[in-house]
């Protein structure tokens, strides 16, 4: 028995930081969107018990430091499972890029292993486990288009975003999300990330309106640390993107276009140096 699962990356169409919480996390409000770029995971039962994880395509730890491994251990303990699993993770989503790849992988592991081990957790039960693993893991379970609040775990499904083209540009370095949040100070970004304006633009379905509502309160923080992020945005706009925004805490920047063919044209015109460029589009399971 082999179960295959796809773990889709995400972008934040808006990201606003509302303040620091008593638990040390930051209160956020975000419009989150799944994209077609994905990792692939394969799961096989292991009667001898134990969990093994093999990673291809990225230099990631295969043990307890890996979120997929921790997701498997958490579900195994919560479900009282004695059997084990052999997991193969094939990475396509860039690591430490602001695209939520690790969280998506963990969410995919919860769903697949819940089926393979027959642990019987409901979607709500899996959501509770996902919250224990990380702020973005619950969205990895939901997917599509969603408004996220709290530290990112309180989700409201939104009207689905229309299919839009995306050019992802990842510079040759990673960014620490914790470091970016530590450096955040209110008022750094003159343009407010307006989630409600984005929700209205998505309902209207016009790519230019959606592009006009893009906003990320963390962008000025990362740009101060890594000015290359601002240069990537500039080059994407010069190449013809309708809008450009840093994904999450960075350093990946995405250029938004009306469709996939337009994204390919922007990628071809982009003045590339040493960045990784990926062309993809938004994804919604209901479209």
UniProtKB/Swiss-Prot annotation:
SUPFAM superfamilies xrefs: GHMP Kinase, C-terminal domain, Ribosomal protein S5 domain 2-like
Record function comment: Catalyzes the phosphorylation of the position 2 hydroxy group of 4-diphosphocytidyl-2C-methyl-D-erythritol.
Gene Ontology BP terms: isopentenyl diphosphate biosynthetic process, methylerythritol 4-phosphate pathway; terpenoid biosynthetic process
Family: Belongs to the GHMP kinase family. IspE subfamily.
Pfam families: GHMP_kinases_C, GHMP_kinases_N
Protein's name according to its UniProt entry: 4-diphosphocytidyl-2-C-methyl-D-erythritol kinase
Catalytic machinery residues: 10, 136
Record NCBIfam families: ispE (TIGR00154), PRK14608.1 (NF011202)
Pathway: Isoprenoid biosynthesis; isopentenyl diphosphate biosynthesis via DXP pathway; isopentenyl diphosphate from 1-deoxy-D-xylulose 5-phosphate: step 3/6
Keywords: ATP-binding, Isoprene biosynthesis, Kinase, Nucleotide-binding, Transferase
EC numbers for this chain: 2.7.1.148
Residues that hold ATP according to the record: 94-104
């Amino acid at each position: 028995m082999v179960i295959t699962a796809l773990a889709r990356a995400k972008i934040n169409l808006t990201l606003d930081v509302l303040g620091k919480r008593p638990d040390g996390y930051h209160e956020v409000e975000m419009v989150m969107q799944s994209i077609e770029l994905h990792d692939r995971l394969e799961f096989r039962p292991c009667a001898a018990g134990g969990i093994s994880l093999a990673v291809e395509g990225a230099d990631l730890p295969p043990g307890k430091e890996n979120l997929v491994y921790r997701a498997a251990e958490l579900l195994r303990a919560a479900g009282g499972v004695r059997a084990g699993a052999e997991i193969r993770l094939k990475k396509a989503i860039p690591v430490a890029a602001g695209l939520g790849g690790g969280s998506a992988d963990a969410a995919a592991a919860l769903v697949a292993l819940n089926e393979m081990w027959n642990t019987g957790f409901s979607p709500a039960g899996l959501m509770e486990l996902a919250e224990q693993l990380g702020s973005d893991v619950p969205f990895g379970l939901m997917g599509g288009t969603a408004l996220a609040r709290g530290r990112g775990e309180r989700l409201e499904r939104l009207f689905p975003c229309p299919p839009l083209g995306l050019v992802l540009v990842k510079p040759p370095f990673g960014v620490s999300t914790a470091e970016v949040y530590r450096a955040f100070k209110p008022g750094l970004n003159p343009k407010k990330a307006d989630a409600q304006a984005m929700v209205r633009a998505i309902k209207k379905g016009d790519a230019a309106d959606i592009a006009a509502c893009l906003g990320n309160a963390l962008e000025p923080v990362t740009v101060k640390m890594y000015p290359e992020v601002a240069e990537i945005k500039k080059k994407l706009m010069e190449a013809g993107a309708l809008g450009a925004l840093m994904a999450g805490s960075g350093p990946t920047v995405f250029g938004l276009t009306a469709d996939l063919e337009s994204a390919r044209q922007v990628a071809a015109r982009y003045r590339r140096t040493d960045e990784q460029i990926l062309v993809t589009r938004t994804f919604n399971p209901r479209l």
